[in-house]
Amino acid sequence: MNFDMIKKENSFDKILIENDKLVESMNFLKNNAEYYFDRLNTIIAVDLGLESGKFELIYDLYSTNTGLNGRISVLVERNSPHVPSVVEVFKSAYFDECEIYDMFGIVFDKNPNLKRLLMPKGWEGYPLRKDYEQNDNRLKWNK
């Protein structure tokens, strides 16, 4: 596997990879001596809008050996929002994947326990999508 990364002062440019190569790419970047990105800092989700029909996921990686940061990007189709889970490579991905599922509705296939974390049980919709319409069913707080 070859990554044409452009090295900056202490990071690499974001590189776009295909969804079906995500787990393989993460394994390679984590275990290859040249890169050794052994830490996943976070996963960021971006709604690119209805016109594009896509979401972008950005995986922020860090190498404790070299001190370099790297970013891997994948595009997810809005009408079929599925992407492979990277929990088997980075255990720290679990909560980010659940939060992104909760807020954007992106399904991380093979996540061992994908569930909503922030929204109350029974909540409909995904609040950080640009097409989300808030209804007026506000939570009733007990006094």
What residue spans do the PLM features occupy?
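Terminal low-complexity/charged segments
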Residues: 1-143
